[in-house]
Amino acid sequence: IQPPKTFSSLLFSSLLFSSAAQAASEDGSRSPYYVQADLAYAAERITHNYPEPTGADKDKISTVSDYFRNIRAHSIHPRVSVGYDFGGWRIAADYASYRKWKESNFSTKKVTEEIKDNYKETKTEHQGNGSFHATSSLGLSAIYDFKLNDKFKPYIGARVAYGHVKHQVHSVETKTTTVTSKPKGGTPAGGPVIKTDPSKPPYHESHSISSLGLGVIAGVGFDITPKLTLDTGYRYHNWGRLENTRFKTHEASLGMRYRF
């Protein structure tokens, strides 16, 4: 009776060893290198802080236009990453380019006054165009994966990035003067005399900043296959400041991570 038990034990042990060896082989065949592609929805926050009237910087003249005071913009952009998985910890380098934010405004101001025997109307028209563009962001992240089970892996991390932000402003102001003579006695009012000329030369300015910014990231990875992971994530990034203008982004993303 003993030999069959011994044979069964040996057979079971050999099968168990074979399965473990195969699993180890499959796990060992997974490269630590990976690439990831994401589509991100970004909420961009541009805040223009003016100096206090009694503060130390009260006399400082800003080169950043008032176009960029408390802007709330949104954009969708792609992002690509390459990384290395240490088994629990990952590092990744990423690159993204954002959509240019643009704004135009038009204003009209009319002033009417009496000058001797005439009515004088002065109309001032202002046309302004502004743009703010986070042209590029090159970042490096350190990420920690929480392995809840074989499929779901929440993660958190920190990111440092080199970003380039620039803005441009162009404005034109035109003044139109209309003079109409008053009626006198039985004489009707005279026809208007109109004169149009630029009240100010066209104005243009362009400034940019390149600096290191800091951010945090979090998300959840779902392993579809041993090599393919669906990733949903959030990241916050502070781009730094261009004088008294701060630029920050909140991003939600969906992407795929492929391990070689």
Curated annotation (Swiss-Prot):
The keyword Calcium does not apply. The keyword Transmembrane applies. GO terms for molecular function: porin activity. Signal peptide: none annotated. It holds the Pfam family Opacity. Residues 173-205 are annotated as: Disordered. It is found in: Cell outer membrane. InterPro entries: OMP/PagP_b-brl, Opacity, Porin_opacity. It comes from the Bacteria. Keywords: Cell outer membrane, Membrane, Transmembrane, Transmembrane beta strand. One of its GO terms (cellular component) is cell outer membrane. Residues 174-186 have a biased composition (Low complexity). Belongs to the opacity porin family. This is Opacity-related protein POPM1. It comes from Neisseria meningitidis serogroup C. The lineage of its organism: Bacteria, Pseudomonadati, Pseudomonadota, Betaproteobacteria, Neisseriales.
